[in-house]
Amino acid sequence: MRYLVMMFALLVSVTLVSPRPANAVDNQLSVVDGQGRTLTVQQAETFLNGVFPLDRNRLTREWFHSGRATYHVAGPGADEFEGTLELGYQVGFPWSLGVGINFSYTTPNILIDGGDITQPPFGLDTIITPNLFPGVSISADLGNGPGIQEVATFSVDVKGAKGAVAVSNAHGTVTGAAGGVLLRPFARLIASTGDSVTTYGEPWNMN
């Protein structure tokens, strides 16, 4: 039985690399939550560099991802805001040679700017060095045929009225997909009250 497999591994550098101008906002979205606060989430400096797969398999797609997610909260109690900032992808493929998708990733190298990571194993508010082993595994039954799968590659707990998370050269692969693969990056801000806002970028073609 073959599977559509998606895997992320992260390099040790935290230097953000992007061909676009620094702080160039790619997309953003705002929403007013139940407490009257305006929640805004942005993606900036997004770059997905598709490369020839090392396994030389025609069903494999490989890429490196750099970018930044930023959030802002305005309104009453903005400084007391608590929530989660997520980055991830919507993955689209015309055909899969199997019945499932498996996903795993290694905790990414990230730089927190103006935010705070409060949950273990982090406990820091500056630079995080990743674990050497995958931290999350996700499986889903897709069956044969076209499909779209949304996967949050990582998330951090944040506090305060604003903050940003940068990721450099996240390594991703998709195997078992016949035809091209489209990746639509997203950033999502989820308040502790349950309110959320998600911004989606333009699809990147990993042919």
Curated annotation (Swiss-Prot):
Places the protein is found: Cell outer membrane; Secreted, Cell wall
Q: What's any GO biological process attached to this entry?
A: monoatomic ion transport
Q: Which UniProt keywords apply?
A: Cell outer membrane, Cell wall, Ion transport, Membrane, Porin, Secreted, Signal, Transmembrane, Transmembrane beta strand, Transport
* Chief place of localization: membrane
Q: What happens when the gene is disrupted?
A: Single deletion is viable. A triple mspA-mspC-mspD deletion grows slower than the single mspA or double mspA-mspC deletions and has reduced Fe(3+) transport compared to wild-type.
Q: Which residues form the signal peptide?
A: 1-24
GO molecular function annotation? porin activity
Q: Which GO terms describe its cellular component?
A: cell outer membrane; extracellular region; pore complex
Q: What does this protein do?
A: A backup porin induced when MspA, the major porin, is deleted. It probably forms a water-filled channel which favors the permeation of cations. There are about 2400 porins in wild-type, 800 in an mspA deletion and 150 in a double mspA-mspC deletion.
Q: How does it assemble?
A: Octamers. Probably forms a goblet with the wide end on the exterior of the outer membrane and a central channel. It is not known if mixed oligomers of MspD with other Msp subunits form in vivo.
Kindly provide the name given to this protein in its UniProt entry.
Porin MspD
The organism encoding this protein is Mycolicibacterium smegmatis (strain ATCC 700084 / mc(2)155) (Mycobacterium smegmatis)
Taxonomic classification, please?
Bacteria, Bacillati, Actinomycetota, Actinomycetes, Mycobacteriales
